[in-house]
Swiss-Prot record:
Belongs to the MISP family. Residues 1-20, 30-39, 156-170 have a biased composition (Basic and acidic residues). PANTHER family: MISP FAMILY MEMBER 3, MITOTIC INTERACTOR AND SUBSTRATE OF PLK1 MISP FAMILY MEMBER. The keyword Nucleotide-binding does not apply. It holds the Pfam family AKAP2_C. It comes from the Eukaryota. It comes from Homo sapiens (Human). This is Uncharacterized protein MISP3. The gene is MISP3. InterPro entries: AKAP2_C, MISP/MISP3-like.
Length: 219
């Protein structure tokens, strides 16, 4: 059976011969130059090489098993090894109550140092709660004075607000010209038919018109 490629080659050769005859040329030897090529299909290709001998397969499986056993032994040894002790954590900071008592005791000992020269060595509480002697190296050690009081940020803000409020009150008194200035308070009037009170702000002021006290009406 002729394949498509062989058919195409045959037709090409026939066209070439017809062209040579039409032009008076000697017939070529194209048919003689054709070479037959034998092609093997993919299914006929040789498969994988011969199987390994049984002894070689056993040796390779034994080596793999030996590696697995050694890996498991190393893992078991690492688990059985005692863990490294963790570094000791730092002691927690002393509570504020103990520090306060320590500073108070130090301040008290500093004030009574002159009166108690003939007395024995005084023992001051440490921040950890253990008493310690106030005499070190043959000389008396005075307790450290408590740190100076510094107002917190909140107290500073409150003080600044109070100062601003006092300054505003002084300015209002200077503007209104009386020392008995009072803050205006909202007035409650029943201006609706249902009897409910309505808050009017700012409150109505009484102004003088033609010598008569009248109430200022605002739309």
């Amino acid at each position: 059976m002729e394949t498509p490629i062989e058919r195409e080659i045959r037709r090409s050769c026939e066209r070439e011969e017809s062209l040579r005859r039409s032009r008076g040329l000697s017939p070529g030897r194209a048919g003689r130059e054709l070479v037959e090529l034998r092609v093997r299909p993919v299914l006929n290709l040789p498969g994988p090489g011969p199987a390994l001998p049984r002894a070689l397969e056993r040796a390779r499986a034994g080596a793999q098993m030996q590696r697995d056993i050694e890996r498991e032994a190393h893992r078991q040894a690492a688990l059985a090894r005692p863990a490294v002790p963790e570094p000791r954590a730092r002691s927690p900071p002393q509570p504020l109550g103990e520090l306060k008592r320590f500073f108070e005791a130090a301040a008290g000992s500093g004030s009574s140092a002159g009166a108690g020269d003939g007395a024995g060595p005084q023992r001051l509480p440490e921040p950890g709660g253990r008493p310690r002697s106030a005499v070190q190296g043959g000389c008396r050690v005075l307790g450290s004075a408590p740190p100076p009081f510094t107002p917190s940020l909140l107290e500073q803000e409150v003080r600044a607000v109070r100062e601003r409020e006092q300054e505003l009150q002084r300015q209002r008194r200077s503007v209104y010209g009386t020392a008995e200035f009072k803050e205006p308070t909202p007035s409650l009037t029943a201006s609706r038919g249902d009897g409910k009170l309505v808050v009017i702000w700012p409150p109505r002021r009484k102004v003088s018109e033609n010598g008569l006290e009248q109430e200022e009406r605002k739309p």
